[in-house]
From Swiss-Prot:
Enzyme class: isomerase
Keyword Nucleotide-binding: no
Organism of provenance: Haemophilus influenzae (strain ATCC 51907 / DSM 11121 / KW20 / Rd)
One Gene Ontology biological process: D-xylose catabolic process
Protein name: Xylose isomerase
Positions of Mg(2+) 2 binding: E268, H271, D307, D309
Amino acid sequence: MTTYFDKIEKISFEGEKSTNPFAFKHYDANQVILGKTMAEHLRLAVCYWHTFCWNGNDMFGLGSLERSWQKNSNLLAGAEQKADIAFEFLNKLGVPYYCFHDVDIAPEGNSVREYVQNFHHIVDILERKQVETGVKLLWGTANCFTNPRYMSGAATNPNPEVFAWAATQVFNAMNATQRLGGENYVLWGGREGYETLLNTDLKREREQIGRFMQMVVEHKHKIGFKGTLLIEPKPQEPTKHQYDYDVATVYGFLKQFGLEKEIKVNIEANHATLAGHTFQHEIATACALDIFGSIDANRGDPQLGWDTDQFPNSVEENTLVMYEILKHGGFTTGGFNFDAKIRRQSIDPYDLFYAHIGAIDVLALSLKRAAKMLQEETLQKIVNERYAGWNSELGQHILQGKTSLETLAQLVQQKDLAPKPVSGQQEYLENLVNQVIYS
């Protein structure tokens, strides 16, 4: 295998006392927690786009990162070299999965014919590398937002020919995902939204994207894809307002088009921040609506109004996220994909390892703390007591539709009900959480 990161062999677990920057302090893949290993709980994945495609550019500056494979004048040869380096990284980091967009792995070319040929060529290579390394595909997707043809959207575009081009990419990306054993297929509508309502037909665009998603579901069943379809919510950026604003919005959309049993959500932490929610809120909402699927692990900056895609570094935040996931029974086909990028000034190639090692340890420690909270029923006992009244005859009659507004009004008057407020104990609960996290 090509050696690009020749400074290290393989990242291993050395424990909390280790000072080796190229070692895990908390992530022991084989440690059993609540009946499953850490690896089985976390199902870690590295993303192709930020890790191997981004060159460090931003809106105000050119690329700052030295990536030899990006300098190859033969774009297809550069993509082959990128695949070599990507799988070297994945193998040395020791994660079980990776994720990609179609044009992350292969150059788009100048025609649909070139696009298909290039994509299939690299998929052949990825298939061989998966066999060689044992690394698997968590999910694939199609980039239907970067090319200028998508400036007015993909499925929501006013031109049906653009809709057809997006369908072509999704068709090929879904087929490749199935071929590579991908466990999910993600749909992120990067430009499925609007800049101004002055030139937008909201009803029409909603119907267009609804039909597009129905076609995706139809194709899934046609080819026998056994993985999970996922929509990734995001409120804005690059458009002013996106139709998949947050988890609750996506659920309403799925219900409208009869897709709530077919598609779940891939939740990104930074997107929750942009939507004005906590990461925990979005996870809890998805679990409550039974559409929780997978996670893009990263963090945003509350002081900034854009997608910073930083690596997760808060055990406090992720313990509560992990707690919600464990309560829900954990992942089925989903996992933690690091949709995160190193900072533009992090120009050492090994900064990629530092970033992923630190983030993986954060999730591992968060898992251990969340498992302790779940086992000790630290919070659940108080929540159960708080809602105990709904297990009474009155509560059950209300929920089962055995009473009415009139009946309840009569009951309150007859019994002169005067319910007394009970403390929510928020401060006490916060203390309990901190006690678990910092013990």
